[in-house]
UniProtKB/Swiss-Prot annotation:
The keyword Chloroplast applies. This is Small ribosomal subunit protein uS3c. Part of the 30S ribosomal subunit. Residues 47-118 form the KH type-2 domain. NCBIfam families: rpsC_bact. It comes from the Eukaryota. InterPro entries: KH_dom-like_a/b (IPR015946), KH_dom_type_2 (IPR004044), KH_sf_prok-type (IPR009019), Ribosomal_S3_C_sf (IPR036419), Ribosomal_uS3_bac-typ (IPR005704), Ribosomal_uS3_C (IPR001351), Ribosomal_uS3_CS (IPR018280). It is found in: Plastid, Chloroplast. Belongs to the universal ribosomal protein uS3 family. PROSITE patterns: KH_TYPE_2, RIBOSOMAL_S3. SUPFAM superfamilies: Prokaryotic type KH domain (KH-domain type II) (SSF54814), Ribosomal protein S3 C-terminal domain (SSF54821). GO terms for cellular component: chloroplast; chloroplast envelope; chloroplast nucleoid; chloroplast stroma; plastid; ribonucleoprotein complex; ribosome.
Length: 218
């Protein structure tokens, strides 16, 4: 069988850049990694608890972390930043306090910025959340996939592949269903491909959603 490599890791350094930018001594590296995970989890939990759109989406595309000796700069890329900015700066300040408390960073300043992405449905993370929301509401998986593809077509992408695996529609035997529209050249390193894997809990069990979006050729 074909061995499938993660498309993002495969393209690191060519079309894909790192989401965390910092240097550390080899002994301290694991601490920095753990810190990054804490930051990302803390932000996602805050957004989950406080700001949910009616469809049950968080709308976070990615979180970038840049660290210096005295500063941690966090950039949150959101598809629907209105959710967080409506009663800004109170919300952002509260989020900043939460992250600071979680990290317990005394001698470092923390700065959070929110950036809007122009085509929310051109991002696989937001699209996966959309499909997850549909599946939770017991919409048939084919309908959810087709709707997701329609949304990406509006975002001017060159191709998309969606895969759902698990006990689809509550069937006894787990299976994998997928659909592709346009081109998705996974073997071409120069092709800029966005990828996301997402798990969703339904009443029948856990389903895995994978999305590949062919954005552009470098």
């Amino acid at each position: 069988m074909g061995q499938k490599i993660n498309p993002l890791g495969f393209r690191l350094g060519t079309t894909q850049s790192h989401h965390s930018l910092w240097f550390a001594q080899p002994k301290k590296y694991s601490e920095g990694l753990e810190e990054d995970k804490k930051i990302r989890d803390c932000i996602k939990n805050y957004v989950q608890k406080n700001i949910r759109i009616s469809s049950g989406m968080e709308g976070i595309a990615r979180i970038e972390i840049q660290k210096r000796i005295d500063l941690i700069q966090i950039i949150i890329y959101m598809g629907f930043p209105k959710l967080l900015i409506e009663d800004k700066p109170r919300r952002v300040e509260e989020l900043q306090m939460n992250v600071q408390k979680e990290l317990n960073c005394v001698n470092r300043k923390l700065n959070i910025a929110i950036t809007r992405i122009s085509n929310p449905y051109g991002d696989p993370n937001i699209l996966a959340e959309f499909i997850a929301g549909q599946l939770k509401n017991r919409v048939s998986f084919r309908k959810a996939m087709k709707k997701a593809i329609e949304l990406t077509e509006q975002a001017n992408t060159k191709g998309i592949q969606v895969q759902i695996a698990g006990r689809i529609d509550g069937k006894e035997i787990a299976r994998v269903e997928w659909i592709r529209e346009g081109r998705v050249p996974l073997q071409t390193i120069e092709a800029k491909i966005d990828y996301c894997s997402y798990t969703v809990r339904t009443i029948y069990g856990v389903l895995g959603i994978k999305i590949w979006i062919f954005v552009d050729e470098e």
